[in-house]
Amino acid sequence: MSWDEGFADRYDEWSAGMTEDVPFYVELARETEGPIVELAVGSGRVAIPVAEATGRPVLGIDTSPAMLAHARERADTAGVELVLREGDMRDLELDEPAGLVYCPFRGLLHVPGWADRRRVFERVAASLRPGGRFAWNAFAFDHSVGARLDGSHQDEPVPHSLRYSVGDNRIDIALDNAGTSSLWWATRNEWLGLIDVAGLEVEALYGDFDRSPFGDESREYVWVTRRPG
């Protein structure tokens, strides 16, 4: 079974423990004028509450047909409008500039390398209206955590194994009886470089979804950036 098929079938189990991000992105959407776009929309875990809270459609983009099928089914059940599109965030093109583009659940970490991430950031910046926001969250970079996880097998939230590659700051996640997916960590300075090269401005860097400041003990980057104008 491929990662796409295996992970799509178990995504809701995998993400069950991640709920605190939903109110954060919902609040950003409520503050937004203009179209709302979610990158790596997955099964609609965040997009559906955003659409429910705002009463507006959310454009969701994902590379996985299996995940989009889950999102479509869940949106129909919830009675909300998601406009779902199969596509790569590196090639983002919108019919109308967005007021908010967001990428929850560390989705940007699946984009490997500086060049590809730069392309994402530049496409997002070009797709925002003046004053529009780009928000995302990601693990705070920590070699010691990666080293501790290397070679481990975990049963929760679903059975999987982890491998850490020091050379390129990569974590490989292998689901039992399914494929493997990878995350590439980025440092704070690397994120700041991407923000700068795309012509965005930092509005806030939080250490959690309660909007507490990022500090030495923070384990999550929660970024909110803005296109000038």
Tell me what each language-model feature is.
Residues 93-100:
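A short acidic, Gly/Pro-enriched loop at the edge of an enzyme's catalytic core
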Residues 118-130:
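A short glycine-rich, Lys/Arg-flanked "PGG" loop and its adjoining helix->strand segment in the class I
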Residues 188-229:
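C-terminal lobe and adjacent flexible extensions of AdoMet/dcAdoMet transferase-like proteins
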Residues 102-104:
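A conserved beta-strand element that flanks and buttresses the S-adenosyl-L-methionine
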Residues 1-42:
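Conserved class I S-adenosyl-L-methionine
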